[in-house]
Curated annotation (Swiss-Prot):
Catalytic activity: 5,6-dihydrouridine(16) in tRNA + NADP(+) = uridine(16) in tRNA + NADPH + H(+); 5,6-dihydrouridine(16) in tRNA + NAD(+) = uridine(16) in tRNA + NADH + H(+)
Cofactor: FMN
This protein's name: tRNA-dihydrouridine(16) synthase
Purpose: Catalyzes the synthesis of 5,6-dihydrouridine (D), a modified base found in the D-loop of most tRNAs, via the reduction of the C5-C6 double bond in target uridines. Specifically modifies U16 in tRNAs.
Highest taxon in the source lineage: Bacteria
NCBIfam families assigned: PRK10550.1
Catalytic residues (UniProt): 98
Residues annotated as site: Interacts with tRNA: 35, 95, 176, 272, 274, 279, 295
GO terms for MF: flavin adenine dinucleotide binding; FMN binding; tRNA binding; tRNA-dihydrouridine16 synthase activity
Encoding gene per record: dusC
Residues involved in FMN binding: 7-9, 68, 139, 200-202, 224-225
Keywords: Flavoprotein, FMN, NADP, Oxidoreductase, RNA-binding, tRNA processing, tRNA-binding
């Protein structure tokens, strides 16, 4: 089976990819989306969101990274796909699934689910423009409101000659509600089409992964939010490893501190780590207590000092 670390705008950046691919056996990663407008984007935009381009489009641990593009104009999507390929992208992924309101209002992401013909045009333009040895893939939801629309959408992607398709098994209207997951539609898609598929949505542990495989008939899975809830989720889903114990998560928080503070995003560190705690609290009750201690801290040094002190207390308690 394959397990892929999916994209999450504003969260799964290159620093998080580097850290999570060091402790998980991911087959590849997908970047946060590169927003395509009506012009060629400068190289620094691609390098900012995918600095791995400077090292063969791989993380430091050697995991391939695809560049994801989000936009609605076939010409400019293709032009920027060409540039990403020239910069060395391992693959080009096209975002037709982002449910964010601001993205949809500008006719990007999931908004295109209402226009399968435009999806076809974007996919075809990118596939025709990019050298054949570089895969062009897409990511969709089941539809805007009606999951039955997925078949026409998938047909558009397939007719555009995409090499692979990730299906998030909810509609845009379904948001991220667990009750809205519909893995059975991925099975129906598999039976009706020939395009290779990746299943995505509500995969939080090994049992979920196995249930998804059994329901969909697909053994390629993408994880996103869950990878932040439990940092070693990739290995849990792929190899049935135990969830990382809390003290190891704290060690990882300290490691993340080194990445963020020494990297190019140090000034954002307080917000970034607090954002991560919002996910960790879903799986680790201890995270809520630690978050209460640091949530009012605004200086990097104060947060780092508190984390070190907390880790020392854990060692004493053990």
């Amino acid at each position: 089976m394959r397990v892929i670390l999916g994209p999450m705008e504003g969260v799964l950046d290159h620093l998080m990819r580097e850290m999570l691919t060091e402790i998980n056996d991911y087959d590849f990663c997908v970047t946060e989306f590169v927003r395509v407008v009506s012009q060629p984007l400068p190289d620094h935009v691609f390098y900012r969101l995918c600095p791995e381009l400077k090292q063969g489009s791989k993380t430091k641990n050697g995991v391939p990274v695809k560049v994801q593009l989000l936009g609605q104009d076939p010409h400019w999507m293709a032009e920027n796909a060409i540039r990403a390929a020239q910069l060395g992208a391992h693959g080009i992924d096209l975002n037709f699934g982002c449910p964010a309101k601001m993205v949809n209002q500008s006719k990007g992401g999931a908004a295109l689910l209402q226009h399968p013909e435009l999806i076809y045009q974007v996919v075809k333009a990118c596939r025709d423009a990019v050298p054949s040895h570089i895969p062009v893939s897409a990511k969709i939801r089941l539809g805007w409101e009606n999951p039955e629309d997925c078949f026409e959408i998938v047909d558009a992607v397939e007719q555009g000659k995409a090499d692979e398709l990730t299906v998030h098994a909810r509609t845009k209207a379904g948001g991220y509600k667990a009750s809205e997951i519909k893995w059975d539609y991925i099975d129906q898609i598999r039976q009706r089409s020939t395009i290779p598929l990746i299943a995505n949505g509500e995969i939080w542990n090994y049992a979920d992964g196995q249930a998804c495989i059994e329901t969909t008939g697909i053994d390629s899975l993408m994880v996103c939010r869950g990878a932040l809830n439990v940092p070693n989720l990739g290995n849990i889903v792929k190899h049935n490893h135990r969830a990382m114990p809390w003290h190891e998560v704290v060690d990882l928080l300290l490691k993340y501190t080194q990445y963020e503070v020494r990297g190019d995003k140090g000034k954002y560190y307080p917000n970034r780590i607090k954002q991560w705690f919002a996910y960790l609290r879903q799986a680790y009750p201890q995270a809520a207590d630690l978050f209460r201690d640091i949530r009012t801290l605004t200086q990097v040094e104060s947060i780092v000092e508190h984390l070190h002190h907390y880790r020392e207390q854990l060692e004493v308690a053990q």
